Amino acid sequence: MNTTALSLLCLVGASVLVAQPRPEDRPLPPPPPVHAHFKFDFGPGHAPAGYTSVQADEVYSTEKGYGFDFGSRVTGVARGADGFVTTNESPFFFSVKVPEGNYRITVTLGDVAGESNTTIRTESGHIMATALVTPPGRTITRTVIANVRRPELPPPPKNAPGGSRVHMFLAGEAEARCWDEKLTIEFNGPRPCLVAMEIVKDDAIPTLFVAGDSTVGDPRHGPGGNWPTQLCQFLAPEIAVCNSAEGGETSKSFITGYRFDKVLSQMKAGDFFLVQFGHNDSKPQWPQSYTEPGTSFKAYLRVFIAETRRRGATLVLVTPMERRNNGDTVGPWARAMRDVAAEEHVPLIDQWAMSKQLWTALGPDVNRAFHDQTHLSGYGGYLLSKLIVSGIQKNVPALARFVSADFQPMDPAHPEPAPAYLQQSSGPGAPPRPVRP
């Protein structure tokens, strides 16, 4: 028996795996696809055939299944027989009730009599596109891809262990936009002008899943103090990102709390799974979730690898970024990831090494990249998102083909300035969170 199988058989508190699963242990086939297709025309004027007209005062309700959401205040503007909706005060949100899955969203933006400038975010603030500018008299269309998920799991068979829902232990997570019944699109920027939108469920789109802790999870408010939230803008509209990371998680608790089961319930052949742990794994004061880098941490990583391979997907290990003090606080877990990647022949993105170089290059400005000693600001998340994509290009050829053709890699020794979109207020009711001076 190889070392992988031995490590898996020795796990306590996780599913016991064997090298050759019995037929009854193999994953069930996915449920039949649910089709969803919506077309919306916004503002005054005549809606084209096949489109649903949406006026500025149409608020989302579960019964209707679509509408402006989270207190959005928009204005309908008429331009002859056509129109659009816009706002100059704050971002606005449009939500559609949909089943979980991947969605292709095509928006039309612009104004025949003025300039528009739009940033698009989805769900919990994932940045899809920035600075989409149209001159007066012009419109543009842009397609983005978003993932929608729910916390429910297929219930286990009678008398079988398992759960029917992801375990959420942090206050407020259950109400987060990433878990609700809706696909939410945020329109931001100096002058967003939304003309039309088409939303199509597309089960053939591959998914990039992400697992991790609060250094990776979506923020509740703000422009995104992590790399997954800012990743989509650097990817072609041919792949969805499902960020399943959450605060407080470790490689062990991600499995025992059914988060990994949720990922596996959506995973299909051709998908990708980026796994980053270490910050909470390194806390011995958390005895129920602590992992030792040379033993249990490696074993849990091998569970992720084995289960992902069973489903025909590609796993990538991402070493944790170092904290602001730029010491060696998570170094042992980063080095353990390197060992497992080499032993199991899986791709590795060494974010830990790149982050140490980056924090050194920032010098006194390193404070601008952090919200506190451990968690990133929007600027820090932006910098690491560029390094992650650069790592994908270098080390994960199958995933690199989804990187946008216009992506510009960043050298960690030469950090870029903060992009303008980080100055924008984002999230329902959230105040502006500018980059620190």
Region roles according to the model:
Residues 1-2:
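N-terminal secretory signal peptides that target proteins for export/translocation
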Residues 5-16:
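Bacterial N-terminal signal peptides
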Residues 20-221:
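Compositionally biased, intrinsically disordered or flexible polar/acidic segments
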Residues 20-39, 137-139, 159-168, 177, ...:
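Conserved catalytic region of serine esterases and O-acyltransferases that act on ester linkages
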Residues 39, 241-243, 345-348:
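Conserved beta-strand scaffold positions in the cores of enzyme catalytic domains, especially
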Residues 122-124, 235-237, 311, 344:
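Short, structured coil segments at secondary-structure junctions
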Residues 179, 189-193, 200-210, 215-306, ...:
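Conserved SGNH/GDSL esterase-like catalytic core that processes O-acyl groups on lipids
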Residues 258-405, 412, 425-437:
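Alpha-helical cap/lid subdomain in secreted, periplasmic
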